[in-house]
């Protein structure tokens, strides 16, 4: 009785305490972010927190379950306009880490990492993220998993400080249920203490000094609850004793009934002597004497019950079920179900075979353990599902796919193919082909210079345009017979389909009129009608009634610019279009000079005349010519002002060039330093998935820059902006723009930008592509298709402006330039490599300096000259190979005549231009063909440069 009173008194005290706690008003706000209505108001919630100086603490609470090794974003806040991040929390299961990214006050993203988190394991976890210091004090982020602190990062930049959010400018994205991934709770708590917020997840934590009192109350409450549990346990024992006593009374009453003494039997006031000394009869067996199924035996001392049935334990009167599952009769990992009586084991787990078992009793459970035998999935006739010719490795209850079998190369994604090698005896290439081994283990065969085909079969290629003189027995395009054996035409154009290429067909259109007299060389027109009296007949004139000898057609709609009222095809008439030759529907013009931003050479400075005297695509009004790193981009527009990066590649478009950006793709994994290196530095993949463990992430396997062109044929595998060689878009640069007999070059581009023809005996000029390069390999076939002239032709690289570029030029014979002003210039026969750095720019000084073989002060330096002094031959094809590595100044040029190497500059080092654009060059020479042009990004330093340096240091 005293104990019961104590229990009641304790319960009263506990209720009073809880009442007092409940009466306290919380000083925080809780928002359920999984509620649709709350999601719609998330912008106002955030703005309230950011603008309220007293709101210094923010908590995010989440309960979730993630499948093993998964990488998911649990929750994030994003801009509705451009989908940029404001706040994002991502779990990277494969790396056992999590990342928190948020917008700093300077508008840039800051990344925080929490390591050693094993929370992507198929189990439910509770997360509490505490951000402190929104407005004052030190800013830190602390993470709790399942009520336990798992990481803290201190001295952080303030998140979202000073940022104004408009209504509807932010939207919330949360983890969506997919497979085993699910989220049951996501709450935002503004304000409050750690212990108060932790209690929402039933976590009892103390914060620090300010929350010490609350922590003490929580500990007192826990102690009182523990004491109450002990008293309830004692009460349970008392009740069990009362049950036993009740059972004893029941048996006593049963004995009284067996003596025939009912409840109404009158008891005498005085017990007779005979009756008082009579021993009452012992209880006899009846239907309720023993537990069901237990045998009851009458004895002199009363009834006696036999043993409890199998699967039960007790005295025969009371029998309770035995829990056989305590003996672990089931196979490891199989669920045991206790029944009354007996037990049952469920089916064997996946990857095992065996039967289910069920039985009754301790002995059965001890003697009959469930047996599950491992299934060898690798012997199912399908190699376990692994790719053919790869290793299938059986494991207990499962299997895994390994690498390729010996003699095969590849992986589980691309398959395992028979190993190819360039080693002797395994080289599959033609005897006149070069063999190279790729990263994926495959082999590439390329026909050598002067040969053409698919690499496995090669035939003689006299004009070195990539097509053999005779057809080869292979289906590839480059196995077909060259339709112009002695004139390079890498596009194999044949207008009249007579199997004679246009380049060598005297009547290319087959209209019976020779090309020299035909006013439509590539369009049959026997009548030669020419309404506007320009040099093009009506059949091929894109402006039949308007004289336009240039036939320029910006939008390629078949209507020449001269008669097209919308030259760029953007739907805006020329008279109203602020960029007449560049499509710009928006017509943006931020400097208001009447020239649209997209075609404005100074988009931030008024310059309506668009003057660009040095032809560097930067208007004179904003051209500073201050270039600290020498890569051709002035410091004010260079995305890496002090690091050489002529290509200006900026993969993540953050305004920082890849060359000086430590995280090119902005996925939170640094390119080189820990926790990197990033196995896909140009494609976001925070999880770093790499199923075949080859060091290249799955997302960029075989296409490193994700430009949809596989690396094997991609001319720039690490630059998504350059995929194929293409000079269809080019800039013309006239190097002697003034004079009485001015003749500018006439450029024709063929074969989808891989062939250029110049037809005029012209003043010096360039055709320059718009693509800029860092390191580059540049090759092509050079051919002068005439016998009537003997002047200069060549190519350029490292072009930065009309005063700064490298040129490789070839003169046929010795000759003094016909104009001796401003100085006498003498050209010698042979190949010359020059660095042009002209103070005067295009004009007579640069013209004569280019003609002259040698150095010219303030104009040109001669870096190398072919000592043979041999000029080019009429109607003979030559193949050149150029290597330029501007980061170290490495230059090397080689020339082939047929299959023979005829000139080699060797290693030449010059750092005048640190990268730039590519193009071709002519000076007073007509009918030049640059065919089968190819460029490829390449920053790898050649081996001969190391030997060159060693030789230089030793001398």
From Swiss-Prot:
Keywords: Calcium, Cell adhesion, Disulfide bond, EGF-like domain, Endoplasmic reticulum, Extracellular matrix, Glycoprotein, Growth factor, Mitogen, Repeat, Sarcoplasmic reticulum, Secreted, Signal, Unfolded protein response. TSP type-3 repeats lie at residues 460-492, 493-528, 529-551, 552-587, 588-610, 611-648, 649-688, 689-724. Residues 637-649 have a biased composition (Polar residues). Residues 281-320, 321-358, 374-415, 418-459 form the EGF-like domain. Residues 657-668 have a biased composition (Acidic residues). One of its GO terms (biological process) is cell adhesion. Glycans are attached at residues 609, 938. Residues 1-24 form the signal peptide. Gene3D superfamilies: 1.20.5.10, 2.60.120.200, Laminin, TSP type-3 repeat. Residues 728-942 form the TSP C-terminal domain. GO terms for cellular component: collagen-containing extracellular matrix; endoplasmic reticulum; extracellular space; sarcoplasmic reticulum. Homotrimer; disulfide-linked. Belongs to the thrombospondin family. Adhesive glycoprotein that mediates cell-to-cell and cell-to-matrix interactions and may be involved in various processes including cellular proliferation, migration, adhesion and attachment. May play a role in ER stress response. May participate in the genesis and function of cardiac and skeletal muscle. This is Thrombospondin-4. It comes from Xenopus laevis.
